[in-house]
């Protein structure tokens, strides 16, 4: 692997540029074939949180998918998920059902962490991921 392959690439889809400019973080960083994705939350294009854990989970996974596609990968390339939940015990089953829609097989490693709050009071879940681009191809 050459030094050029190890150059860090910032991944910030156009709709997230305001977050990069305001809060000074990237949605993801890619080095070689590895992509580290910042926590994705259940907000829509207008930054409005979804109504419940199911809607927020779908929105978070859709955002994750979009960032990975921007980085040249897909959800199939995810090797690790770390999720943060404001009601882990009460909502992990509903979250898990949504997760399984996006990862129907070749399950990534997954750690679920209970937290007292996320960046907005209405948020219930945040999803972080690590992906290895190309690893999900059959």
Roles of regions detected by a PLM:
Residues 1-62, 66-79, 85-138:
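N-terminal presequence-like segments and the immediate start of the first folded domain
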């Amino acid at each position: 692997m050459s030094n050029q392959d190890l150059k860090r690439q910032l991944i910030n889809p156009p709709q997230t540029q305001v977050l990069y400019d305001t809060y000074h973080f990237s949605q993801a960083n890619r080095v070689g074939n590895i992509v580290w994705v910042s926590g994705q939350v259940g907000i829509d294009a207008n930054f409005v949180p979804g109504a419940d854990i199911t809607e927020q989970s779908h929105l978070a996974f859709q955002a994750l998918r979009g960032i990975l596609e921007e980085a040249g990968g897909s959800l199939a390339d995810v090797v690790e998920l770390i999720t943060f939940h404001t009601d882990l015990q009460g909502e992990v089953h509903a979250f898990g059902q949504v997760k399984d829609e996006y990862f129907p097989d070749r399950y990534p490693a997954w750690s679920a962490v209970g937290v007292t709050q996320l960046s907005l009071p209405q948020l219930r879940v945040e999803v972080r991921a690590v992906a290895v681009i190309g690893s999900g191809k059959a």
